[in-house]
Amino acid sequence: MKKLFLFFTLIFTAFAANSGLFDKKQTFLKVDDAFAFSATLSTDKSQLQAHWDITDGYYLYQDKISAELVGKSNPLSLHTQQAAELHQDPYFGEVKVFTHSIDGIFRGTFNNADDKVEITYQGCTEGFCYPPETKVLRIGDLAISQEQIVEKTVEKNTALLSEQDRLADGLFHSKWTIFGFFLLGLGLAFTPCVLPMLPLLSAIVIGQQQRPNMMRAFSLAFLYVQGMALTYTLLGLAVAAIGLPFQIALQHPYVMIGLSILFVVLALSMFGLFTIQLPNSLQNKLNTWSQKQTSGAFGGAFAMGMIAGLVASPCTSAPLSGALLYVAQSGDLFTGAATLYLLALGMGVPLMLITLFGNKILPKSGEWMNTVKQTFGFVMLALPVFLLSRILPEVWEPRLWAGLATVFFIWFALQMSKNGFGYAIKIISFVLAMVTVQPLQNWIWQTQTTTQSAVENKSVSQVKFKQIKNTEELDRTLAENPHSIAMLDLYADWCVACKEFEKLTFSDPQVQQQFQNILLLQVNMTKNSPENKALMERFNVMGLPTILFFDQQNNEIKGSRVTGFMDADAFSNWLKALH
């Protein structure tokens, strides 16, 4: 009896002990319970408002949240009110995640009820990782939210909302904003990227052997600007669709050298070395239609305007970035094209006025016209110098300008008479030639003045950037940032405004004082390497120059991005606002 009692006791004890083996099996929530997702549409249909309720102990990966309009290639960028947290993930290492909840917006144009938005996200919890979850939302099925989400905490300071973001927002909320881009174009007409187009237009109108009347001069100038605007618009849309690689491709040395050769040939023709004209058979046909060959002249002006658009295309400004940002996020090509066209038209109007004014006041006949024509030949030679300075080492730029200026002043001196006022101009021209030749003398004799050395080394010696090669190195460097802010400068050798930043802005004592409390990082985008492309895609870079700012959580400070040139005072105030 005792043995039987002991047997059953052991059996039940074993069952009791082992019954708990499966009690510890953890149950995980369904994905929709772990990450309860909902979405609404703003009243003006410019924002898709997304919300996630995240169960305690679960988290969503920041870089796994994405959205796009079905059938459109451009992704929609997410702006969240909550800051992501650093998390040591057993699957992906150190990552940024969201916990508890997410309130965010996807900006775009959501007017078509049949359009669909595809939103993808992925999350995990301890011991379990969910596969990517995708929600396909039909625009017409979304409820309209009575309260439009504004990015309350997205911007570190509302004053920091960058100009390109304000312009893009303006286009989202009112299509009438496009006419404001015409006024912005007027202001861009006198930037270093647009001014080189003036000699080309002037050479076409003023540099002709037979000076045109005002109506014809206006027609030539107008067609030139239309050609420029067309190229600028098409290239802008291509950049918005393809991205910075297209912009970089236009700056390939082969393209720059080819355009430079073209301008040199045109300049030599203005010196009378040869005449560029159509084949006789085609020219005779045109003469039959119009003895004055107006169609040929007008067609040439339009073609030269298109070439001028190539010269201006790589230059990024806040208005251009705003228009490109709108096109990339909304997919609205019509509004984007109209915006870019009006921006280019505004850039061209001052060029037209300057040319027409010069056409009216300069002499219209006599031997003086040959001198005028040859003078504009020299002016046209400035374009190859401008283009080649983008691809040659920086030291060559002053040498090329010095060579062109020296030859011009010597030539100009030889054109002057030896009597009276002409003799005085001759002496002054020779003196100026002696001054401008100095960079060539220093190069030939390998000498360098103390002042020149100080100027050349000022920005290089006093501003030290840590060079970043890829996204992994960027993340590591940001994680070790001892300062409250990090600045990432995206730079390219062909970018004119980037060089202006280096020489005029970064070298300013006020700016350098602000730099003392900022981690300075720089990426050279000249070669468009795979690492460069990864950075461009990650930060949705539209053009150069672009400067990004990051907080202590390694997040880009929303609204702080700088595109286009800023002078020292404006940039210093921008940095102060960041702090």
UniProtKB/Swiss-Prot annotation:
**InterPro entries the record matches:** Cyt_c_assmbl_TM_dom (IPR003834), DsbD_gamma (IPR035671), DsbDN (IPR028250), DsbDN_sf (IPR036929), Thiol_diS_interchange_DbsD (IPR022910), Thioredoxin-like_fold (IPR012336), Thioredoxin-like_sf (IPR036249), Thioredoxin_CS (IPR017937)
Q: Which species does this protein come from?
A: Haemophilus influenzae (strain PittEE)
- E.C. code: 1.8.1.8
**What are the protein's UniProt keywords?**
Cell inner membrane, Cell membrane, Cytochrome c-type biogenesis, Disulfide bond, Electron transport, Membrane, NAD, Oxidoreductase, Redox-active center, Signal, Transmembrane, Transmembrane helix, Transport
Q: Which SUPFAM superfamilies match?
A: Thiol:disulfide interchange protein DsbD, N-terminal domain (DsbD-alpha), Thioredoxin-like
A molecular function (GO) held by this record is: electron transfer activity
Q: Which gene encodes it?
A: dsbD
Q: Where in the cell is it found?
A: Cell inner membrane
Annotated signal sequence is 1-16
Q: Name one GO cellular component term.
A: plasma membrane
Membrane disposition: Multi-pass membrane protein
This protein's name: Thiol:disulfide interchange protein DsbD
All residue ranges annotated as the Thioredoxin domain in the record = 449-579
